[in-house]
Amino acid sequence: MIKFLFKGLMRDRSRSFFPILTVVIGVMLTVFIYNWINGAEFNFIDSSARFNTGHVKIMSRAYAREADQVPNDLALVGVRSLMDKLQELYPDMIWTPRIRFGGLLDIPDAQGETRDQGPVMGLAVDLLSPGSHEPRIFKLEDALVRGRVPQRAEEILISEDFARRLNVQPGDTATLISVTMQGSMAIANFTVAGTIRFGVEAMDRGAMIADIAAARTALDMENAAGEILGFFADFLYRDPDARQAAARFNSAYNDDPDEFAPVMDTLSNQAGMADLLAMMRMFSRLVLVVFIAVMSIVLWNAGLMGSLRRYGEIGVRLAMGETKSHIYGTLIMEALMIGALGTLIGTAVGLAESYYLQAHGLDIGFMMKNASLFVSNVMRAKVSPVSYGIGFIPGMAATFLGASISGLGIYRRQTSQLMKELET
């Protein structure tokens, strides 16, 4: 029966071409948009984790309340012992201390006078310790534009766009003017080892990357850090695991009234990420519902048109004794065949487009000029195992619904009127 119905569909293009084309377009768009949203979500999570939040972040309670202001006077102290404790409690995670700071970067001329200066967003990380993961987390080798990565504590990296505005070359001296942990003025000289471009507008506008040892000396933060970031070993964020780790850590300090006691927060609870990710997932589900609804309506209309063209055929089949239920069932089987074929073609086309966008990306830097989010300027799709099957939901559901609704007209045909219909 299935082979017979399939041959009938292939021989009569009026019954198959338009419905298959509708399913192909709908499934292709569903697969592509799903992968696009998947890629955007991964982009947000990956960029935010690497540059800002980690998968989990440990701060003092007082610092956490004012984290947007980067209050280093409320930073964690006794960081070495806390790091040892974290390695013992969570040996499968990567832990790294960081210091955020703001200030002015002053570029002197040959006489030592100010030639140019600009506001800088500083980030002190562990660049030089043996086995440090920070160069890999920041992908410094890939981000390097000019010069080299720091090899000594007094060397820094600055963003390429910032360096061009200040006319700074690798090897030049730069003076950081900032504030110490105690609130006094901090002045320290550094050498620009190289320039970087992360492709993240929030970092590329005016970032400075320094080794944490030199920053601690400059900011009077010995054995202190504003934040300790934790990453899963595979660098893939898993919210349930992160929440479990945070709950376990925080339970040990629930009864501690000290404002400087450490507190762990997850990526999803920082910088509005939970709302952003929830919105993206809701949009992904909305895409499925919309395409199922639209395709069902289109295929319903196509089924009604097909019923008009096949009005006489259905009448003959009824006159020959074929039951209405059997005819209705064959119409649904034909629709499911159309849905399966259209879904396979649409999925293949959608995956091809997604793989291309995953490899090459789409530069949206012109839209991110004033962005404060830590998100890459190059948006990429991300193909996952779900991508291969997501198209079957709208492809099969829409064809089934369309055929089910349009085929109900069969039950309104009166057997007593068949001969009169055939005579006309």
Task: Give the label of every model feature segment.
Residues 19-29, 281-301, 335-346, 387, ...:
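Alpha-helical transmembrane segments of integral membrane proteins
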Residues 61, 65-66, 71-223:
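A structural signal for hydrophobic secondary-structure junctions
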Residues 5, 30-35, 281-319, 327-332, ...:
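A hydrophobic alpha-helix feature that marks transmembrane segments and, especially
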Residues 303-309, 313-358, 390, 394:
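Transmembrane alpha-helical interface segments in multi-pass membrane proteins
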Residues 345-392, 404-407:
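Short helix-loop junctions at transmembrane helix boundaries
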Residues 40, 234-297, 306-308:
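Peri-transmembrane interface segments
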Residues 28-56, 354, 361:
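Alpha-helical transmembrane segments
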Residues 1-31, 325, 412, 417-424:
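N-terminal Sec/SRP start-transfer signal
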